[in-house]
């Protein structure tokens, strides 16, 4: 290789090394990987609003840009402020820190980036405030005139690529809060999107998380996270059978009244599972929770991933979904059992047993039950004969013939014995 080429390579590598040393080691807002996105790309895209830089400028999201400016204006008017200067100054002071939170170089100049932080951050806070306080709403505000728009916005705030660093939200909230408000005040509306999955939620304190999606995830998982459900083992956890297969092995399914969706128990040959509502928001919300766990929780706290893996083991077909629905475990508002199967099957793609799998104890106990010889024999008998009415009829007929043959033989022996006694 010639010396000039060597010099150009050296220069190029040195530039890469310098860029690497100045880059954040752990960005907190990332784009979803190709593998995760491939199963359902729409689940990771906002519907109507871009928050943060990743989806900024998309044509289909432009209508909401004017509402960001309107909400900032209404905020300033409510606070009797004529200028946004102090907020711009605050955003400039943390611009560099905010840039390092994103997993790629943001191609905005300094002014554009600061403007985005301010408009997006204030919109998020004002929308959540107005969601709580009707007195803050403008009577002509279409966002609160049409309920479906609120639903879209709540959805978009739970998209992993559509986030701002939480310290931006926290700073702007504290700069604009009223006396009776704390940060819990604006978190509560975000919990409503998952209220059908996590019905009983109390916010004692805001968990440390990089953004709003992470906070909502951690709140929903908090009660379950305190329980050590996994077992340390040198062996890999084996999958359990489908719901139909477990039923054939003598395992019953019961609806649980636990507060947390994730609190599954196995006792006295019964799996107790809380109700899971399958709706039009299920797949998107759970996919973004799974993506958050994939990137940010390391080997711990993969509770949503573990739960989806568990349910994906149980539901291998629409028949499994039907069995769980009939036992009150699945609440289906999408349509038929085939839709439930499709959603859970799709959610289960690219999910794996985590290092500290939340349900390893349950899997171990269930597989122990199903592995006993008498249970294996019963499974084979049920699968081979009792699932087919004609096969069952044949078995019963054969048993009847056997009993009849035994009776005839017994009668013949007794008759012969009686005749011998008579002759003697």
Predicted regions: what is each one?
Residues 1-386, 413, 417-424:
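Acidic, Ser/Thr- and Pro/Gly-rich low-complexity regulatory segments
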Residues 374-410:
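Membrane-interface recognition of transmembrane alpha-helix starts
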């Amino acid at each position: 290789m010639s010396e000039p080429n060597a010099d150009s390579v050296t220069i190029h590598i040195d530039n890469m090394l310098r860029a690497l040393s100045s880059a954040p080691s752990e960005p907190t807002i990332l784009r979803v990987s190709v593998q995760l996105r491939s199963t359902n790309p729409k689940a990771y895209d906002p519907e109507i609003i871009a928050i943060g830089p990743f989806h900024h400028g998309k044509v289909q999201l432009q209508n909401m840009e004017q509402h960001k400016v309107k909400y900032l204006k209404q905020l300033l008017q409510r606070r009797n402020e004529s200028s946004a200067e102090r907020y711009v100054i605050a955003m400039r002071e943390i611009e560099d820190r905010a840039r390092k939170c994103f997993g790629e170089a943001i191609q905005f100049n300094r002014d554009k980036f600061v403007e985005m932080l301010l408009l997006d951050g204030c919109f998020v806070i004002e929308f959540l405030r107005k969601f709580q306080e009707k007195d803050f709403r403008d009577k002509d505000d279409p966002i609160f005139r049409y309920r479906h728009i609120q639903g879209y916005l709540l959805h978009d705030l739970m998209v992993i690529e559509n986030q701002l660093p939480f310290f931006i939200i926290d700073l702007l909230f504290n700069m604009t809060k009223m006396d009776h408000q704390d940060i819990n005040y604006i978190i509560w509306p975000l919990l409503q999107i998952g209220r059908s999955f996590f019905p009983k939620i109390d916010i004692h304190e805001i968990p440390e998380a990089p953004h709003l999606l992470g906070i909502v995830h951690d709140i929903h998982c908090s009660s379950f996270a305190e329980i050590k459900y996994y077992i340390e083992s040198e062996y890999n956890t084996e999958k359990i059978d489908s719901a139909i297969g477990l039923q054939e092995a003598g395992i019953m399914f019961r609806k649980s009244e636990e507060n947390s969706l994730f609190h599954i128990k196995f006792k006295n040959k019964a799996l107790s599972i809380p109700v899971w509502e399958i709706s039009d928001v299920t797949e998107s919300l759970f996919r973004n929770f799974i993506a958050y766990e994939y990137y940010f929780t390391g080997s711990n706290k993969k509770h949503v991933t573990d739960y989806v893996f568990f349910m994906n083991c149980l539901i291998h077909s629409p028949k499994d979904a039907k069995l769980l629905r009939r036992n009150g475990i699945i609440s289906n508002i999408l349509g038929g059992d085939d839709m439930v199967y499709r959603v859970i099957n799709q959610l289960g793609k690219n999910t794996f047993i985590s290092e500290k799998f939340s349900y390893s104890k349950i899997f171990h106990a269930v597989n122990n039950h199903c592995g006993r010889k008498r249970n294996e024999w019963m499974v084979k008998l049920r699968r081979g004969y009792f699932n087919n009415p004609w096969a069952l009829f044949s078995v019963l007929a054969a048993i009847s013939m056997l009993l009849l043959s035994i009776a005839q033989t017994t009668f013949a022996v007794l008759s012969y014995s009686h005749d011998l006694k008579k002759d003697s």
